[in-house]
């Protein structure tokens, strides 16, 4: 028995196994992308994977990219313009309304952080001007380190904390009301509360009809 030839065959089989695994992974990734875009998956051949011009990657839809820059107010306006949209998923980009609301909420927080930073700078300048000749009476500065324990103490600004709390409550209420209206519209239009895609919608409608017929 020629062990050298056996070793070469084993190496060749390993290389083929790796190639097949890579091709299978590319095919699976491509099909996942098509399914997420609500398109019917195509039938592929192994030769398609070898196409030099093919590039497979994680790409985001333009609608999802725009959603990252929406504020809650812009989200509400967008929702009013799309009352017929799907409950579980938008028609084009595959982004759910929950994700859209989350992105809108995150942008609102970023805007609020910028506003509070500017407000903090203005308040600090005003305090320094008013208290130039006023000695500090045990007031903790912005950041203070205990030399014995090494702990850092940061003084809270009550004004900014209260402003943040009020803003978060207001934005949370707006997002809740927007989501509630959207769910009510979907229930009125389709008779089902939510669905992921067209097949799921048809299945939910069928269940709804059967449940009404059995009553």
UniProtKB/Swiss-Prot annotation:
Keywords: mRNA processing, mRNA splicing, Nucleus, Phosphoprotein, Spliceosome
Modification sites for Phosphoserine: 45, 124-125
Location(s) in or outside the cell: Nucleus
Biased composition (Acidic residues): 48-57
Region (Disordered): 36-97, 111-149
The keyword Phosphoprotein belongs to this UniProt entry's keyword annotation: yes
Family listed: Belongs to the SYF2 family.
Biological role: Involved in pre-mRNA splicing and cell cycle control. As a component of the NTC complex (or PRP19-associated complex), associates to the spliceosome to mediate conformational rearrangement or to stabilize the structure of the spliceosome after U4 snRNA dissociation, which leads to spliceosome maturation. The cell cycle arrest of SYF2 defective cells may be due to the inefficient splicing of TUB1.
Subunit and partners: Belongs to the NTC complex (or PRP19-associated complex), composed of at least CEF1, CLF1, ISY1, NTC20, SNT309, SYF1, SYF2, and PRP19.
Name recorded for this polypeptide: Pre-mRNA-splicing factor SYF2
Species of origin: Saccharomyces cerevisiae (strain ATCC 204508 / S288c)
Phylogenetic placement of the source organism: Eukaryota, Fungi, Dikarya, Ascomycota, Saccharomycotina
Gene that this polypeptide is encoded by: SYF2
């Amino acid at each position: 028995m020629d062990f050298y030839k056996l070793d070469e065959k084993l190496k060749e089989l390993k290389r083929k196994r790796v190639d097949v695994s890579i091709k299978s992974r590319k095919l699976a990734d491509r099909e996942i992308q098509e399914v997420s875009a609500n398109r019917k998956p195509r039938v592929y051949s192994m030769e398609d994977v070898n196409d030099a011009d093919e590039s497979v990657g994680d790409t985001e839809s333009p609608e999802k990219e725009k959603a990252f820059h929406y504020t809650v107010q812009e989200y509400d306006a967008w929702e009013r313009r799309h009352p017929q949209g799907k409950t579980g998923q938008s028609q084009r980009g595959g982004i759910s309304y929950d994700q859209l609301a989350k992105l809108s909420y995150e942008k609102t927080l970023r805007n609020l952080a910028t506003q509070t930073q500017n407000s903090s700078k203005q308040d600090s300048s005003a305090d320094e001007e008013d208290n130039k000749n006023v000695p500090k009476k045990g007031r903790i500065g912005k950041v203070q380190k205990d030399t014995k324990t090494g702990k850092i103490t940061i003084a809270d600004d009550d004004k900014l904390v209260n402003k943040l709390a009020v803003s978060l409550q207001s934005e949370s209420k707006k997002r809740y009301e927007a989501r509630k209206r959207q769910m009510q519209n979907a229930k009125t239009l389709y008779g089902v509360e939510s669905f992921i895609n067209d097949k799921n919608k048809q299945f939910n409608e069928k269940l709804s009809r059967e449940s009404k017929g059995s009553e």
